[in-house]
Amino acid sequence: MATQRVLPQSKETLLQSYNKRLKDDIKSILENFTEIIKTAKIEDETQVSRPAQAEQDHYEMHVRAANIVRAGESLMKLVSDLKQFLILNDFPSVNDAISLQNQQLRSLQEECDKKLISLRDEIAIDLYELEEEYYSSSYSQWDTDLPLCEAYHRVDNWASPSSSSSSTQGDQEEVEILPSQETEPQHHLNGQGTSSLEKM
């Protein structure tokens, strides 16, 4: 059996005032409604004339109806005050709601972790099968220490002879240009070449 929480004195006094307001408003509504019903009853002849009595009853009904409306508005205000009191002071309920949300988030996190671990294991198995297939295929002529991406890159370069031949041809042209530049006669700054040497 849950133990009853002990409220501070200020909160206890506030709750007692709420309870008193509730009882007073309900009592006011009940009494005024009962008097309206009594006033609507047609009485026997009295010393007051019927027009005066009707006017008096009409005024009394208006007053008591206004009292009922005022008591109803007071009850609505009381409901609003109670909601505010519960929101600001009902810490156990707030803590329970936070704990429940934390449990839901933890369960969702555990589920996501399990899915990620399962996905990691599946990827590892597929990668192992791909490596086995690679090393047992024709690509195994390359260095087995190379990663798969670098080995495939080398195979692509080897499979395109046009690019490799053009690159080797460009290298040969550069090699041919360099010796030709070295065999050309060097001219002096004064414009005299080998002819000046022959004259000497």
Swiss-Prot record:
Q: Which parts form a coiled-coil structure per UniProt?
A: 93-123
Identify the InterPro entries for this entry.
Med22
Biased composition range(s): Polar residues:
189-200
Q: Name one Pfam family in it.
A: Med22
Q: Which GO terms describe its molecular function?
A: transcription coregulator activity
Sorted UniProt keywords: Activator, Coiled coil, Nucleus, Transcription, Transcription regulation
Q: Name one GO biological process term.
A: regulation of transcription by RNA polymerase II
Q: Which PANTHER family match?
A: MEDIATOR OF RNA POLYMERASE II TRANSCRIPTION SUBUNIT 22
* Known partners and oligomeric status: Component of the Mediator complex.
Described purpose of this protein according to its UniProt entry: Component of the Mediator complex, a coactivator involved in the regulated transcription of nearly all RNA polymerase II-dependent genes. Mediator functions as a bridge to convey information from gene-specific regulatory proteins to the basal RNA polymerase II transcription machinery. Mediator is recruited to promoters by direct interactions with regulatory proteins and serves as a scaffold for the assembly of a functional preinitiation complex with RNA polymerase II and the general transcription factors.
Record's protein name = Mediator of RNA polymerase II transcription subunit 22
| Species whose genome carries this gene | Takifugu rubripes (Japanese pufferfish)
